[in-house]
């Protein structure tokens, strides 16, 4: 029981107190209390930590840790927090007013609290207390109201209805910059000049007074001795307590003062009368003050020891308090430093503004001074304009005519006009020189002004740059660093993934006639760490468990793979007639079989610049839609200048074939069909069929295609930002997931296990195949349809193994169980579904395809959908062709040597 209480107390402390130093201080205070057993000191120390309303439940959590004899005193010293609301009604029109003051509001980040009551007023008379939190006024909640809105709400009605609950704390905030603090009611009243109450100081008699009940029936006596106090300290005191007696059981100790017995006051009672009262009754109700006269009965040695212990405890408590409050001091210092820094920035900005203003004033003064000097030297502007007009009037060209007329009219035998013209010329030259000098000075002045304006603009620009640099916060710098780290991580991830893919491709050896080797295992990347949210309830869309081939609604197509570009062939016609059918050899029939067979290639010759393509058409008559579907898939071979063609790249698994070597390629020989058994008649249920791998001729050398630089879409989706899925705050694979926390090392076995969180929008559109009871031995993704939630997420592709769904491991599930679990997880509530997948490495063809149902001939659309996946595929020297009923693996050599060999049919479709 004690361990359970201690564990619950620690959980509550961890939940309510975030600062580790304050937690340590709280535990040290409790440790010191169990050494000193002083409740008043304990409560005083606890109030330093429990200094917020949300931490008040710690007082109730500490109460079970207090011994029973101290719990009454503990309850008196701690604030009594009421859980129930109290409703009172006040008359707003009362002559004395409401009789209360409130503080707080939404703008201060706290509720509304009563901070002062007028003694004898309305609020005091109805039982309101200082430290009550006002919850409702006139029926309206005020949790989101400002102080002014609360005052206006009180004024709306004559009778004010108030609901309160007692907290015992009052918010304190001296200035807008200061953080909100809380004070207990007794501390607040004491600082305001009132009488301190409720703290329980050691000298206060009422706080240490307690009552004990003793029944003397069946006992020999009280088991204690009493003594009268000296003159300076009168009273009746317990001088000795026998061990194991009734007095020891009820908690009486040496030095306790007896204040009252059965209603009789012992404060001024005589010693004999006190003895008679204690002996007169067999049932006693005794009120005592613990330790009031302990010093009267202590020896000198005990006094010295107690003083030494008190000093040690005081030093220890001071040290613990100092350590506990160190974090608060550091926080205050940081706040002070931040305030000082802001003040310095503001001061520097003010100094810059003042300096800028002084510089501008100085520039304007210099301009005024220069203008005055210039006006003194050259006169006002109006006088400057006048000589210009005079020079224009005395210009010799326009005044030539009237002057000649005046000369002719005043002629008196002399020629005064010649002298007159000379004087006017001299005057015009003098004026032009004056104008040139003035224009030069004006030009110099304008240049000087222009330079000063440029300097002023440069200074303004520099000031703005400095201010902007100062205003850049540390958060923005951290965001910049974080974005750079993210970009670096994405580049590293892409580079690592490209290296893994290239290494996996380089490990594939050149093959001539043998079967393709198994795909190289890609070493999984170290999975990012994140806890898997197992019990999440998520939102839903039905999954179609019935095979799509049984109905004639438009099928959902898998998500489109990227088309690999090819240069247009000059000699390739739009449609080429069907290749000639080869004669049957051995057990192979060629006339009416839908199976394709390649003839031996011609003698190797250098590849032409453009290789003609051939269309494959079935020899058996089919509907026009099927002919069109099968006729639009040309056969092309790679050459050194072109990547792998579309037909060879688009295998059923969606991964292009590539080879690390570059060799010459030859045009393909005509392809024919080999025989196959007729499909069994029955209901149109799809069955699994496997590809027939027909071996090439013994003299045919397979030339691998040139290594394609275009990566499959699934690998691009895993590596880089693809489509719209990688927008801001989007993660394709969840971080922090540890696969070894869910699976054993044998289950992981080198797989790249990742956690995907897919948002439930629309339908999931994810098809599964395999199962623990299938040849595959695991649940894998067979198709990801366009427009579904899985395709929009982009983290799951065809071939991935499903290992867990919403925390449930499905590695040992059958296909039906896995589909049911996936449908149930999608139908549950919530917004997300969690899938744990093992990423499929680049591999050869190993998927399964559903067979063509018997109803395909009746529906051209359905037949086209089924036969689109039955195209022949060339992989590493093998020729793969899909059969409607089963999948066969044949080599041409085995056909010729062992006629009794027959392919085994595949397992039924799960």
Swiss-Prot record:
Keyword Transcription attributed: no
Residues in coiled coil: 299-377, 417-482
GO terms (BP aspect): actin filament bundle assembly; brush border assembly; inner ear auditory receptor cell differentiation; inner ear morphogenesis; inner ear receptor cell stereocilium organization; neuromuscular process controlling balance; parallel actin filament bundle assembly; protein localization to microvillus
Polar residues biased stretches: 650-664
UniProt-listed InterPro entries: Harmonin_N, PDZ, PDZ_sf, USH2_Complex_Protein
Pfam families given in the database record: PDZ, USH1C_N
Keyword terms, alphabetized: Cell projection, Coiled coil, Cytoplasm, Cytoskeleton, Differentiation, Hearing, Phosphoprotein, Repeat
Subcellular localization(s) per the UniProt record: Cytoplasm, Cytosol; Cytoplasm, Cytoskeleton; Cell projection, Microvillus
Main location, first listed in the record: cytoplasm
GO molecular function: spectrin binding
PANTHER family the UniProt entry points to: HARMONIN, PDZ DOMAIN CONTAINING WHIRLIN AND HARMONIN-RELATED
Protein name per Swiss-Prot or TrEMBL: Harmonin
Source species of the chain: Mus musculus (Mouse)
């Amino acid at each position: 029981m004690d361990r359970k209480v201690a564990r619950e107390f620690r959980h509550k402390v961890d939940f309510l107190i975030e600062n580790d130093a304050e937690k340590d201080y709280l535990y040290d205070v409790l440790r010191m209390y169990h050494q000193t057993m002083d409740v008043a000191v304990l409560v005083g120390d606890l109030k330093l930590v429990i200094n917020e309303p949300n931490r008040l439940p710690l007082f109730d959590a500490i109460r079970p840790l207090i011994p029973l004899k101290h719990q009454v005193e503990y309850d008196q010293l701690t604030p009594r927090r009421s859980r129930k609301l109290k409703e009172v009604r006040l008359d707003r029109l009362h002559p004395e007013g409401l009789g209360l003051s409130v503080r707080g509001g939404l703008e201060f980040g706290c509720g509304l609290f009563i901070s002062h009551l007028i003694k004898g007023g309305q609020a005091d008379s109805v039982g309101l207390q200082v430290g009550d939190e006002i919850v409702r006024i006139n029926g309206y909640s005020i949790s989101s109201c400002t102080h002014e809105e609360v005052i206006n709400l009180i004024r709306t009605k004559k009778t004010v209805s108030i609901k309160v609950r007692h907290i015992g704390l009052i918010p304190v905030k001296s200035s807008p910059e200061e953080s909100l603090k809380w004070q207990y009611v007794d501390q607040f009243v004491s600082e305001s000049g009132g009488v301190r109450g409720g703290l329980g100081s050691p000298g206060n008699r009422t706080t240490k007074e307690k009552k004990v009940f003793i029944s003397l029936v069946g006992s020999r006596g009280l088991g204690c001795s009493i003594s009268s106090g000296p003159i300076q300290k009168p009273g009746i005191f317990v001088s000795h307590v026998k061990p194991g007696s009734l007095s020891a059981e009820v908690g009486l100790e040496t030095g306790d003062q007896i204040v009252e017995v059965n209603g009789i006051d012992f404060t001024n009672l005589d010693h004999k009368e006190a003895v008679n009262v204690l002996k007169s009754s067999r049932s006693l109700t005794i009120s005592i003050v613990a330790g009031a006269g302990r010093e009267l009965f202590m020896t000198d040695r005990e006094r010295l020891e107690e003083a030494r212990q008190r000093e040690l405890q005081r030093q220890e408590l001071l040290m613990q308090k100092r350590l506990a409050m160190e974090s608060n001091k550091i926080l205050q210092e940081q706040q002070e430093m931040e305030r000082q820094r802001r003040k310095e920035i503001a001061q520097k900005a003010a100094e810059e503004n003042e300096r800028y203003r002084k510089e501008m004033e100085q520039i304007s003064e210099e301009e005024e001074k220069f203008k005055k000097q210039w006006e003194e030297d050259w006169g006002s502007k109006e006088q400057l304009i006048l000589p210009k007009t005079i020079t224009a009037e005395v210009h010799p060209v326009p005044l030539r005519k009237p002057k000649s007329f005046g000369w002719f009219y005043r002629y008196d035998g002399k020629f005064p006009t010649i002298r007159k013209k000379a004087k006017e010329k001299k005057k015009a030259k003098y004026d032009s020189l004056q104008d040139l000098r003035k224009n030069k000075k004006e030009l110099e002045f304008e240049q000087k002004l222009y330079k000063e304006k440029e300097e002023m603009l440069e200074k303004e620009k520099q000031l703005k740059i400095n201010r902007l640099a100062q205003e850049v916060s540390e958060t923005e710098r951290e965001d910049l660093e974080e974005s750079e780290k993210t970009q670096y991580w994405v580049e590293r991830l892409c580079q690592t993934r490209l290296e893994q893919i290239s290494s996996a491709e380089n490990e594939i050896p050149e093959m001539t006639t043998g079967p393709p080797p198994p795909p190289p295992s890609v070493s999984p990347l170290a999975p990012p760490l994140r806890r898997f949210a197992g019990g999440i309830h998520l939102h839903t869309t039905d999954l179609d468990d019935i095979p799509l081939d049984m109905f004639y609604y438009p099928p959902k197509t898998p998500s489109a793979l990227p088309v690999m570009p090819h240069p247009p062939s000059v000699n390739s016609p739009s449609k080429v007639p069907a290749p000639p059918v080869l004669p049957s050899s051995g057990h192979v029939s060629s006339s009416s079989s839908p199976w394709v067979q390649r003839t031996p290639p011609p003698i190797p010759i250098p590849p032409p610049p453009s290789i003609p393509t051939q269309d494959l058409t079935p020899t058996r008559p089919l509907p026009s839609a099927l002919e069109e579907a099968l006729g639009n898939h040309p056969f092309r071979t790679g050459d050194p200048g072109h990547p792998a063609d579309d037909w060879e790249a688009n295998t059923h698994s969606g991964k292009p074939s590539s080879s690390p070597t570059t060799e010459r390629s030859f045009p393909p020989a005509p392809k024919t069909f080999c025989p196959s058994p007729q499909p069994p008649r029955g209901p149109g249920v799809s069955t699994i069929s496997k590809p027939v791998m027909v071996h090439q001729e013994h003299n045919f050398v397979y030339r691998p295609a040139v290594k394609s630089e275009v990566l499959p879409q699934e690998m691009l989706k895993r590596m880089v930002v693809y489509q719209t899925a990688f927008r801001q705050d989007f993660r394709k694979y969840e971080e922090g997931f540890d696969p070894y926390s869910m699976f054993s090392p044998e289950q992981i076995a080198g797989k790249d296990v990742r956690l995907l969180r897919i948002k439930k929008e629309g339908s999931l559109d994810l098809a599964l195949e395999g199962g623990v009871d299938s040849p595959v031995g695991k649940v894998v993704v067979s198709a990801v349809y366009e427009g579904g939630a899985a395709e929009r997420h982009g983290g799951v592709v065809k071939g991935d193994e499903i290992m867990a769904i919403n925390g449930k491991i499905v590695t040992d599930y059958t296909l039906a169980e896995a589909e049911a679990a996936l449908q149930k997880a999608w139908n549950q509530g919530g917004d997300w579904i969690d899938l744990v997948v093992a990423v499929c490495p680049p591999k050869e063809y190993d998927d399964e395809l559903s067979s063509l149902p018997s109803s395909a001939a009746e529906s051209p659309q359905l037949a086209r959908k089924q036969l689109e996946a039955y195209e022949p595929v060339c992989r590493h020297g093998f020729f793969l062709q899909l059969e409607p009923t089963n999948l066969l693996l044949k080599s041409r050599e085995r056909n010729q040597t062992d006629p009794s060999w027959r392919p085994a049919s595949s397992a039924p479709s799960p």
